[in-house]
C-alpha cells in the first residue's frame, strides 16, 4: 500500500455502515483507515403525515391507529428511520409500505395510498410547495449533527426527546453517526503521518474556501456542510458497536415486527 500521500479515496457512507454492522464481504478494518473529512454531513430527517388525515399535532398522531408509512425499500435509510420514529412515538399498529421510487411514494402520499413518510430536509428545499400549500403536517425531526437546528423545522422536537432508555439512545446515536460521516475521504492505512497531516490541513482550507462553496453549490444544488478531519475521526470513534445495539439496528432495518423501545 502506498504511503506517500498521493492516493486519496472517496467512499460512500456504506463503507462505514457495512463494517460496523458486520455485513458479509467486508475485508477492511475500519479503525485502520484514516478518515480525513467529508464535504457534507448535516441533514435533518422529518416525519410527516398527509394533511387530510387531520393529525395536526403529536397528541393526535400518537392516538391514531394503523398509520401506513411509505418508503423505498426494506433497509433504506428512510424506511429505517421511519420505523424508529414510529417506535419511539408509540404509534399503534403502524404499517410499512415499500417498493416505491421517491416520485411514486410522493404521489402515493398525496393520493392517500399511504399516510406518512420520513424524509430529509433537502426534499422540502427542492419541493417548497409541500410547505407553502400545507400538504403535510410535520411532527418530529432527527437533527444530524445533534443540536443543529433547521430554520424550517426548529419548532419540532428532536426524536431523541422520546428515547427513554439507554438502548434507544444508543440506537439513535448509531443512526446519527452513520449518517454524519457523509461521503468521507480516506487515506491508505500506511500513509506517513506528515503526509496525512498535510492533506488534512489542505482539506480544512478547501472546505473554508469561498470558491469551493460556490462550486459545490453549483454542482450539487445545495450548500456544503463539511465534516472536518478531527470531527470525522471522532464520529467513527464514537459509533456504538456493542452487539445489542447492532442487533437492534438490524431489526429496525429489516422486515420483521417493529421492535419495542
Give the location of each predicted region:
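Paired acidic/hydrophobic, glycine-rich loop segments that form the ligand-binding mouth/hinge
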Residues: 4-12, 70, 114-121, 138-140
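Solvent-exposed coil/turn segments that connect beta secondary-structure elements
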Residues: 13-15, 51-53, 121-123, 144-146
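Short helices/loops that flank or line small-molecule/ion binding pockets
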Residues: 1-4, 84-88, 103-118, 122-134, ...
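Hinge/capping helix and adjacent helix->loop/strand transition within the periplasmic-binding protein
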Residues: 1-7, 15, 19-111, 163-170, ...
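Mature extracytoplasmic/periplasmic domains
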Residues: 143-148, 204, 208, 212-237
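Short, hydrophobic secondary-structure boundary micro-motifs
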Residues: 8, 139, 214-216, 248-249
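C-terminal lobe and pocket-closing loops
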Residues: 126-207, 244, 255-261
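Extracellular/periplasmic bilobal clamshell ligand-binding domains
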Residues: 210, 228-261
Amino acid at each position: 500500500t502506498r504511503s506517500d500521500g498521493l492516493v486519496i479515496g472517496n467512499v460512500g457512507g456504506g463503507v462505514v455502515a457495512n463494517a460496523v454492522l458486520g455485513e458479509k464481504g467486508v475485508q477492511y478494518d475500519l479503525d485502520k483507515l484514516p478518515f480525513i473529512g467529508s464535504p457534507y454531513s448535516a441533514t435533518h430527517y422529518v416525519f410527516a403525515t398527509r394533511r387530510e388525515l387531520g393529525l395536526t399535532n403529536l397528541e393526535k398522531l400518537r392516538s391514531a391507529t394503523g398509520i401506513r408509512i411509505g418508503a423505498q425499500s426494506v433497509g433504506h435509510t428512510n424506511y429505517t428511520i421511519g420505523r424508529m420514529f414510529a417506535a419511539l412515538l408509540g404509534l399503534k399498529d403502524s404499517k410499512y409500505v415499500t417498493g416505491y421510487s421517491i416520485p411514486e411514494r410522493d404521489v402515493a402520499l398525496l393520493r392517500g395510498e399511504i399516510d406518512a413518510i420520513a424524509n430529509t430536509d433537502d426534499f422540502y428545499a427542492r419541493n417548497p410547495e409541500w410547505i407553502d400549500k400545507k400538504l403535510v403536517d410535520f411532527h418530529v425531526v432527527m437533527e444530524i449533527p445533534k443540536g443543529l437546528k433547521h430554520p424550517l423545522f426548529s419548532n419540532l422536537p428532536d426524536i431523541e426527546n422520546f428515547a427513554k432508555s439507554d438502548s434507544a439512545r444508543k440506537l439513535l446515536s448509531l443512526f446519527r453517526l452513520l449518517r454524519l460521516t457523509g461521503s468521507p475521504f480516506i487515506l491508505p492505512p500506511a500513509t506517513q503521518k506528515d503526509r496525512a497531516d498535510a492533506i488534512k490541513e489542505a482539506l480544512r482550507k478547501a472546505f473554508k474556501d469561498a470558491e469551493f462553496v460556490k462550486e459545490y453549490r453549483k454542482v450539487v444544488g445545495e450548500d456544503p456542510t463539511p465534516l472536518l478531519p478531527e470531527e470525522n475521526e471522532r464520529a467513527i470513534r464514537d459509533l456504538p458497536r456493542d452487539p445489542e445495539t447492532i442487533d437492534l439496528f438490524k431489526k429496525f432495518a429489516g422486515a420483521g415486527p417493529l421492535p419495542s423501545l
